Every structure is written in structure tokens, then in C-alpha cells.
Amino acid sequence: MGSRFGRRKERNGDMLPLYESQSPQHLDSLENENDERISKLTGKVKSLKELTMNIGTEITSSTKLMESMNDSFDSTKSLLSGTMTRLKNVSKNGGISIWMWLAFFCLVALILVLVRF
């Protein structure tokens, strides 16, 4: 009969560790079961490691893409800012309001889009 500390009494009253009281075949089957579980666990750990590495690679590439997009937006912002400043100067000096220029550019953009498609 097993005790709560993993020991078992022999007929002569000695206490033996529970693993010594098991048959060798049973111990071999337990060892094989442990080996199978270890190999499954190793496979899962490898899969998680690969997934983590892929996530890291994706994060790195996404960060680079966002940085390049940020640089592009900054250059576009400065270009548009300069264009708007020049447009304001032209509209003030030429007597044509900025709204007329805006309507003109929208019309040109619309024509370009319609011609393209």
C-alpha cells in the first residue's frame, strides 16, 4: 500500500521508495511515456521559438516600413507647405483668390483622373 510520501511497506516492515516497488516493465513504460512527453514538449517549444522569431522579424520589417513612410510623409508635408506658401503669394499678388486656384487644381486633377481611366 502506498503512503503519502511515495513509499511502500514490504512484508518484513521495511519502507522502500515507490519506484523500487514497481516492476521493471512498468518502470520502462513510464520512462517511455516520459520520453514521448519530452519529445512532444520539445517540438512545441521549437514551434513557439520559431513563431517568436517570425514575429520579431515581422516587427522589425514593419518598423522599417513605418519609418520610411514617416520620412515620405515629412518630405511631402514640407513640399506641400512650400507649395501652399507660393500659392498664397501668387494669389495675393495676382489678384486671384486662393479658392479660385484650389478650384483650378481640383479641376485639373479631375481631368487627369478621368483621362487616365
From Swiss-Prot:
What GO terms describe the biological role, i.e. biological process, of this protein? endoplasmic reticulum to Golgi vesicle-mediated transport; intracellular protein transport
Q: Which SUPFAM superfamilies match?
A: SNARE fusion complex (SSF58038)
Region feature Disordered, mapped onto this chain: 1-20
Domain of life, per UniProt, equals Eukaryota
User: Which parts of the chain span the membrane according to its record?
Assistant: 95-115
Major localisation: Golgi
> Topology: which residues are Cytoplasmic?
1-94
Its localization reads:
Golgi apparatus membrane; Endoplasmic reticulum membrane
**Stretches assigned to the t-SNARE coiled-coil homology domain:** 28-90
Q: Which UniProt keywords apply?
A: Coiled coil, Endoplasmic reticulum, ER-Golgi transport, Golgi apparatus, Membrane, Protein transport, Transmembrane, Transmembrane helix, Transport
Look up the record and report any one GO term of the cellular component aspect.
Golgi apparatus
Q: How does it sit in the membrane?
A: Single-pass type IV membrane protein
GO terms of molecular function? SNAP receptor activity
> What InterPro entries does UniProt report for this protein, alphabetically?
BET1_SNARE, T_SNARE_dom
* Residues on Vesicular side: 116-117
Q: Which Gene3D superfamilies match?
A: 1.20.5.110
- Record's compositionally biased regions (Basic residues): 1-10
Function in brief: SNARE required for targeting and fusion of ER-derived transport vesicles with the Golgi complex.
Indicate the family of this protein: Belongs to the BET1 family.
Subunit structure of this entry?
Component of a SNARE complex consisting of sed5, bos1, bet1 and sec22 or ykt6.
Q: Which PANTHER family match?
A: GOLGI SNARE BET1-RELATED
Output this protein's name.
Protein transport protein bet1
Q: What is the lineage of its organism?
A: Eukaryota, Fungi, Dikarya, Ascomycota, Taphrinomycotina
